[in-house]
A protein has these predicted regions:
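NTP-dependent small-molecule kinase module
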Residues: 2, 156, 160-206
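Conserved lysine of the Walker
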Residues: 16
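Hydrophobic positions on the alpha1 helix immediately C-terminal to the Walker A/P-loop
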Residues: 19
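Phosphate-end processing signature that detects enzymes handling 5′-triphosphorylated RNA
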Residues: 198-360
C-alpha cells in the first residue's frame, strides 16, 4: 500500500484552512490517491470543550491535545489496514509535534515520557512537513481572524509562528512556504511540494559554505534549534553511477529513525529521489541487498533565522552550512562563512570513511 503522510502546520494566519481546501481539490482532481484529512485537535477542543486561555497551565491543555491527537493518528493507521484503497494521502491539520510550540523542551520531554514516546519516533511518522509562514510577520499583508478559536494578537502570533517551525526542525523533510501577498502564489508553492512528494522526486537550488572556526554555535539549544546525530551509509549502486544510494540512521536522545534516499548533486542543484522513512528491519534488508561501501558520521544542527531554515553539518574537523538559495537571504551575525562549496560530491567524498565491506 502506498501511503504519504503530510503534516500541515504553521502559526496563526498561515492560511491552513484555505490551503487545505485547495489540497482537497488538487488530490481529487489530479491524482488517483484517496485523501484523508485529520482535523486540528486544538481547535476542536477550543470550540467545543475548553479554550487554552481558560486552563490553569499550558501543560495540562497540551497534554489533552497530545492524547487526543495521538488517538486520532493511531485511528487513521487502523482504518488504513482495512481500507481497500491502494494509494492514500493523509493530511494532518497540525501534527502531534505542534504541542512543542507551547512548551519548553523540558516540559515537552516530560509530556513524551508520560506516554512512553520519543520525539524522533513521532517525527518519523510523517513523510513530509509543510510549514505555512504566518502573514503576521509582514506589515503589508493583512493579518486575519477567520478562525474563531484564535486568540493571539499580531506580536504573539509572530512568536508562536517562530516556535511552531522550531518545533519541527528535527524533521528530515521540512518545507518552509513563505507568506505571499498573492494567496494563489502560496497555494501554488504548496501544491508543487505535494506534487513532488507524490512523484518521488524533488529538485532544490541549494547553497553550501564551509564555516569559519569563529562561528559561534553556543547560542543554539533544544529550545531554539535541533541537533541530531546522523550516520550516512553509502551503498553500492550499479544501476546509475550519477546517483548515490544512501541509508541514514538518525539518533536523538536514545531514539532512532531510518531513511533511504537517492541523491544527486549538480552544481547548486540537489536532486532527491524516493526519500522514505523506513523501519530498522527495512534498513538492514536494504544494506544487505546493496552492500555498504563507505560511511559518514556527522551532526546536523538545524535552526531558523529571518524566516529561513539553515542546517549546520559538522564532520570530523569540518563544518558546512546548507540552505535553500534565496537572493534576499541573510545569515545570522554569529555565523561566519569561509568559502562557498562548488563541488559537493568532492566535498562529501573527502568526509567518507571507505570500507571494503560492512556487516550491519
Amino acid at each position: 500500500m502506498d501511503i504519504i503522510k503530510i503534516a500541515l502546520t504553521g502559526g496563526p494566519s498561515g492560511g491552513k484552512t484555505m490551503i487545505l481546501e485547495k489540497i482537497k481539490e488538487y488530490v481529487r482532481e489530479n491524482t488517483d490517491y484517496n485523501l484523508i484529512i485529520v482535523p486540528e485537535t486544538a481547535t476542536e477542543l477550543s470550540n467545543n470543550i475548553i479554550r487554552p486561555q481558560d486552563v490553569l497551565n499550558a501543560y495540562d491543555f497540551q497534554n489533552t491535545v497530545f492524547k487526543r491527537q495521538y488517538f486520532k493518528e493511531c485511528e487513521v493507521d487502523d482504518v488504513l489496514k482495512y481500507n481497500d484503497k491502494k494509494k492514500n494521502i493523509i493530511v494532518y491539520d497540525r501534527g502531534i509535534i505542534d504541542n512543542k510550540a507551547y512548551l519548553n523542551q523540558e516540559l515537552f520531554d516530560m509530556l513524551l515520557s508520560s506516554y512512553d514516546k520519543k520525539e524522533l519516533e513521532l517525527l518519523s511518522n510523517y513523510d513530509l512537513v509543510i510549514y505555512l509562514e504566518s502573514v503576521s510577520h509582514y506589515d503589508n499583508i493583512e493579518y486575519g481572524f477567520n478562525n474563531k478559536a484564535r486568540y493571539e494578537d499580531k506580536k504573539s502570533a509572530v512568536q508562536l509562528d517562530n516556535k511552531t517551525v522550531e518545533a519541527w526542525l528535527g524533521h528530515n523533510n521540512l518545507k518552509v512556504v513563505r507568506a505571499r501577498e498573492n494567496k494563489q502564489d502560496k497555494i501554488d508553492d504548496v501544491i508543487k511540494i505535494i506534487d513532488d512528494e507524490i512523484n518521488d522526486i524533488r529538485k532544490e537550488k541549494i547553497e553550501n559554505y564551509e564555516l569559519d572556526n569563529e562561528s559561534d554555535l553556543s547560542i543554539y539549544d533544544d529550545n531554539n534549534s535541533k541537533l541530531i546525530n546522523e550516520t550516512d551509509y553509502y551503498l553500492e549502486n550499479i544501476d546509475n553511477k550519477d546517483y548515490k544510494y544512501i541509508l541514514t540512521k538518525r539518533s536523538y536522545k536514545n531514539s532512532f529513525s531510518y531513511i533511504f534516499k537517492t541523491v544527486k548533486y549538480n552544481l547548486d542543484e540537489k536532486t532527491t529521489i524516493n526519500e522514505k522513512n523506513i523501519s530498522e528491519k527495512e534498513f538492514l534488508r536494504i544494506a544487505c541487498k546493496y552492500g555498504v561501501i563507505s560511511i559518514i558520521e556527522k551532526e546536523v544542527l538545524s535552526f531558523y533565522y529571518d524566516r529561513r531554515k539553515f542546517d549546520v553539518i559538522s564532520y570530523d574537523g569540518k563544518k558546512r552550512i546548507e540552505f535553500i538559495y534565496d537572493k534576499d537571504l541573510k545569515v545570522p551575525s554569529n555565523i561566519k562563512l569561509k568559502k562557498k562549496i562548488d563541488d559537493m560530491d568532492d566535498f562529501i567524498n573527502n568526509q567518507k570513511k571507505f570500507i571494503k565491506k560492512l556487516k550491519i
